[in-house]
Amino acid sequence: QTAFQISSMEEKVAAVTALLRSAQETHGCEKAFIYCNSLSGSVDFGPIARETGLKIVTPLDVYRRLAPQYHSLAVIAANAQGTAGIERTLLTANPALTLRSTGLLPVVLSIEAGEPPEELVARHRLPELCAWYESVGAEALVLGCTHFPYFKEVLARQIRLPILDPAEEMLRLLDA
């Protein structure tokens, strides 16, 4: 995934466009649900949607709508590619927004290894990270990685910050 994200924009656009065109031709695909923050941040899906005629929804569509509602947000994502794309989207939608973000690839790897959410949240000290975010003025925590709903309920019980998870709003946008 990281190798793809750091490849040239032309290579990424060509690969994604070919994949989506194949889905259209083979399966009659009319919509695409891109459930990956770092991929969404490394490829501009607007031109691809126009070229293919597909309705494409990404987590960034949700962040674009959320940004004007806040003055300060905390973002946790899988890696710097993910945080960069999320930050670019949020700040384009609300240039006055204060952002603090963290890439947490070790958390992603723990999820993929099957570590229980309770242990993962404690071992990676996520409540302490969120307490710091709150202490510096964050109004909410953005789950900027689609792996992170795995521990969302456990973390929510241990922090005061509201958690923003784009998944449900993405489904609504896809059906709109």
Segments from the language model and where they lie:
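Non-catalytic structural scaffold of enzyme domains
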Residues: 1-176
